[in-house]
Swiss-Prot record:
Subunit composition and interactions: Interacts with AKAP9, CEP72, ODF2, PCNT and TUBGCP2.
Post-translational modification: Phosphorylation at Thr-387 by PLK1 is not needed for centrosomal localization or pericentriolar material expansion but is indispensable for spindle-pole stabilization.
Name this protein carries in UniProt: Centrosomal protein kizuna
Role summary: Centrosomal protein required for establishing a robust mitotic centrosome architecture that can endure the forces that converge on the centrosomes during spindle formation. Required for stabilizing the expanded pericentriolar material around the centriole.
Originating organism: Bos taurus
Coiled coil: 77-124
Residue ranges with Acidic residues bias: 603-613
Gene name as annotated: KIZ
Keyword Coiled coil belongs to the record: yes
Length: 727
């Protein structure tokens, strides 16, 4: 320590150099470091080489495989343990299955034995039943042979149950017609036709005699009850021919008791003529020829009974019709149609039934038929209802096809009224019937809205039987009233179109022409207003059809109108009634409805010039107000007192019948304005027609401004259409 300190002191002080020992030590340390480093590198190189060698790899694989082997061994052990457990479970299940199989096998054996026993028992029972059936069949055959032998030995005869598709007879009882009734006495054989099945059941019993006897006089009509044992079989009044098998009084009374007990009704059995079959031998009665004759006789007797019943019913109906009080012409016409159609429908039935009738029966029925026909003719001639001679056209109207062609209910009612008018006019025009008391009745329908108290005078006049004695004016009024019923809402209504409805419209047009001819024959002046009223029935919406309808009426009146227009110029039908107005003094009233086409040539030329105004005014409907109805009523009552001036009564617009209303169509509006234009044109020409028109303005003033103010329609256009134009 001294040295070090000295050294240290000497270095410090003397700054001496390091000694060689130091260097040697350092060199020695460095050498050792180099050697250790070389070793380290050698070891690393060897390790690397070793890792790269196969031995090392094999060792690594071996180690890995060894580890895997250990794992496999462990998993194998676990699997063995699990498999052992599974085996134990399988053994247990197998033990259970074997036990159940043994039980099922035992049950199978038991069931098989039971099935075998049941099969054996069923075979035994079927065999026994078959043996019993065979024995029963043998017994039935033996009984049938015995019964047939005894029946043939006794000589009994039962006719065939089915002949020509009809069951002729069968053994039946009284109550249900299924059991056999035995009686100590011989009875009669009933043959009752069933209307539903067209089969015939017979009631029979043992007959002690050796003969089967039929009498033609035993066919009677028995009144049967509606139900027998709760089943509807025979209706009341059904024809039931009765065939007798014996002729004693005891048998008749016994048959009467059977009929009264079975059917609960009265039966009047009467014996008729004895036929030659009473003395005929048995083998003749049982021959096929006699069987067919018996069937024919039965059918003829049934037809005789039905014919007699039909005739008696006809006689009763005729007596009831004669005793019945008169009804409305609608029902009267229907009754006449039915009475006229019945004789036409009955001759085929009589002809069909007469084919099976014997000569004696037909001759016996002829007096009764003649008497019946005479009674029917007397009842028809003495009937108080409307009776006419039926023609082919009327039969067409009566046929049901007319009702299907009419379309709706309103047109059917109008068709019925048309038929009544045609009947009345046909009876009036017929040359064979010279009776003047034609009955013209309006159908009294309580639900008709068009009838009112204003119709009473015309109806009373029309219902009068001696209408021709009242004068031509009343005659014309009645016919026009009847025609007005055909179009209560106006002829121009589209629902009331009749021109396209054939054959009713054609017949009506022809009858209208006959009516005009009848008016001429009674020296009644026919004027243009009547043509307008008659043509109102045929008004339609189209212009060409209106022209056709009025041209048919104009044909009969063309020549006479021109001749009488000059004669009766002082009583012109074109007078337009007017009343003094508050503003203009005189205002034209409601003009008369003229048909298109019944005008002069000058008027037709004037109407063509004003066609535009007419088309505008035609679209405005005309409505009949209450004031106008009251005006018509007062005018009608005033016109009845003016019998002398019949021409002006029929032509004045207020004297039209109450039933003829102003419709809401276009044709009447056109004629209204056309008359105004014609009147203005004729006044400028100075014709006699216009002169009397001016005279009528001063005398027949009936309308005023107050009347137009009372109108229900407040529309100015409607009032303008209703108010006539001033010339």
């Amino acid at each position: 320590m001294t040295e070090r300190s000295g050294r240290g002191g000497g270095t410090r002080g003397a700054s001496a150099l390091p000694s060689p020992d130091y260097y040697e030590q350092v060199a020695h340390l460095q050498q050792g470091l180099r050697n250790s480093e070389k070793k380290r590198l050698d070891l690393e190189r060897k390790l690397y080489e070793y890792h790269q060698s196969d031995v090392c790899r094999a060792k690594l694989k071996y180690i890995k495989l060894k580890k895997y082997l250990k794992e496999i061994c462990e998993s194998e052990k676990n699997a063995r343990i699990r498999n052992q457990e599974y085996l134990k479970q399988f053994e247990r299940i197998q033990a259970n299955i074997t036990a159940s199989l043994e039980k099922l096998q035992e049950l199978k054996i038991e069931f098989e034995t039971q099935i075998k026993k049941m099969q054996l028992l069923s075979k035994d029972s079927l065999g026994k039943k078959g043996e019993l059936k065979d024995e029963d069949k043998e017994k039935v055959v033996m009984r049938a042979e015995i019964n047939s032998g005894t029946a043939m030995s006794r000589g009994l005869y039962q006719p065939a149950t089915i002949f020509m598709g009809r069951q002729m007879s069968a053994v039946s009882g009284i109550g249900d017609f299924t059991t056999e009734r035995k009686s100590p006495q011989p009875t009669k054989n009933f043959s009752i036709p069933d209307p539903h099945s067209h089969q015939q059941t017979a009631q029979s019993s043992d007959v002690t005699g050796s003969r089967v006897v039929q009498t033609p006089g035993d066919t009677q009509c028995l009144n049967k009850s509606d139900k027998i044992d709760g089943k509807t079989s025979l209706q009341i009044g059904e024809k039931t021919p009765v065939t007798a098998s014996a002729l004693s009084e005891e048998e008749q009374t016994h048959c009467f008791e059977i009929g009264s007990n079975a059917c609960q009704s009265k039966s009047n059995l009467s014996e008729g003529k004895k036929s030659a079959e009473l003395h005929s031998p048995l083998w003749e009665r049982l021959s096929p020829e006699n069987r067919t004759t018996d069937l024919k006789c039965d059918s003829s007797r049934r037809s005789e009974g039905s014919e007699g019943e039909i005739l008696t019913r006809e006689h009763i109906e005729v007596e009831e019709e004669r005793a019945r009080p008169p009804v409305s012409p609608l029902s009267g016409s229907e009754s006449c149609a039915s009475e006229n159609e019945c004789p036409q429908e009955k001759p085929p039935a009589r002809k069909a039934s007469s084919d099976h009738l014997p000569c004696e029966d037909s001759q016996s029925q002829e007096p009764f038929r003649k008497k019946q026909e005479e009674q029917e003719e007397e009842s028809l001639s003495s009937s108080s209802d409307l009776t006419v001679s039926v023609s082919e056209d009327d039969l067409i109207l009566k046929s049901p096809e007319l009702q299907t062609n009419l379309g709706d209910t309103m047109e059917q009612e109008d068709g019925t009224e048309t038929l009544n008018v045609i009947h009345s006019e046909q009876e009036r025009d017929a040359p064979s019937t010279g009776k003047p008391n034609c009955i013209l009745q309006a159908p009294s329908t309580p639900d008709s809205p068009n009838e009112s108290f204003t119709n009473l005078p015309a109806k009373e006049l029309c219902n009068h039987s001696d209408i021709l004695r009242e004068g031509p004016d009343a005659y014309r009024t009645a016919v026009l009233h009847q025609l007005s019923q055909l179009c209560p809402r106006g002829g121009s209504d589209k629902e009331q179109v009749r021109f396209e409805q054939t054959p009713a419209s054609g017949l009506l047009r022809t009858r209208s022409g006959q009516h005009i001819a009848a008016l001429k024959g009674h020296d009644t002046f026919v004027q243009e207003e009547e043509v307008a009223k008659l043509s109102g029935v045929f008004l339609v919406s189209k212009l060409d059809q209106r022209t056709k309808a009025t041209a048919l009426l104009k044909k009969d009146l063309a020549e006479e109108h021109d001749n009488r227009l000059a004669v009766h110029s002082s009583k012109s039908s074109c007078s337009l009634p007017s009343t003094p107005s508050d503003e203009s003094g005189i205002r034209n009233g409601k003009p008369t409805l003229w048909p298109k086409g019944v005008t002069t040539r000058e008027q037709e030329d004037e109407s063509r010039e004003e066609s535009t105004e007419e088309s505008m005014a035609a679209r405005m409907p005309i409505t009949e107000t209450k004031a106008y109805q009251r005006l018509k009523q007062s005018a009608l009552q005033g016109s009845t007192h003016q019998a002398g001036d019949g021409f002006q009564e029929a032509t004045a617009p207020t004297s039209q019948p109450p039933g003829l209303k102003t419709g809401s169509g276009t044709f009447k509006t056109k004629t209204t304005h056309k008359i105004a234009s014609e009147a203005s044109f004729s006044s400028s020409e100075g014709s006699p027609l216009s002169r009397h028109e001016n005279e009528g303005k001063l005398t027949t003033n009936l309308k005023s401004k107050a009347f137009w103010s009372e109108s229900d329609e407040s529309n100015s256009e409607i009032e303008a259409a209703l108010r006539p134009r001033t010339p």
